[in-house]
């Protein structure tokens, strides 16, 4: 089931819906939801493969996709095919320190048609603890043909400036 109540709020107030973030364990539902968000005015669709909340991951949503890059690819590809607006992806470095697959994930996202990837520079197991590993984001920038957005630890004005100098396409705070 899809809940579009927030999208309806925008329609009712006359505000425009810039981007809609979506996640789920059913690939067809993600694609159909993206299509509906576009119909309601979303100019960007953001698929969240970065959520590490245990009850979300246990249902096969969010960061659970990092364990199956083929499934992640299919979800991105079907969503790209379903909409005419840009599709971006939010993800993490990998499952844990022994399973960092961010470079593979980015390649799969590129191949599937994503227009950008936002990387939370921690693993699923880390959740929001410890330090973000910006080195992996720098590696991603070096190998990616699409913009990479650093997503974490933007605590002051100096961080985004340093990030930009490193070639990262942007920075966002959680």
What are these model-derived regions, one by one?
Residues 1-174:
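Flavin-dependent oxidoreductase catalytic cores
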């Amino acid at each position: 089931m899809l809940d579009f109540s927030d999208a309806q709020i925008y329609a009712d107030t006359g505000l425009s819906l810039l981007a809609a973030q979506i996640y789920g364990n059913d690939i067809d539902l993600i694609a159909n939801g993206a299509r509906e968000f576009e119909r309601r005015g979303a100019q960007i669709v953001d698929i969240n493969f970065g959520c590490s909340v245990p009850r979300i991951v246990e249902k096969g949503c969010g960061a659970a996709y990092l364990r199956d890059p083929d499934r992640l690819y299919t979800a991105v590809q079907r969503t790209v095919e379903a909409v005419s607006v840009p599709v971006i992806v939010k993800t993490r470095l990998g499952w844990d320190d022994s399973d960092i697959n961010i470079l593979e994930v980015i390649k799969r996202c590129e191949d599937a048609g994503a227009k950008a990837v936002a990387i939370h520079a921690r693993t699923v197991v880390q959740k929001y603890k410890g330090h973000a590993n910006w080195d992996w984001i720098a590696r991603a920038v070096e190998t990616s043909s699409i913009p990479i957005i650093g997503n974490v630890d933007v605590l002051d004005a100096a961080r985004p400036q340093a990030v930009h100098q490193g070639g990262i396409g942007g920075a966002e705070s959680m």
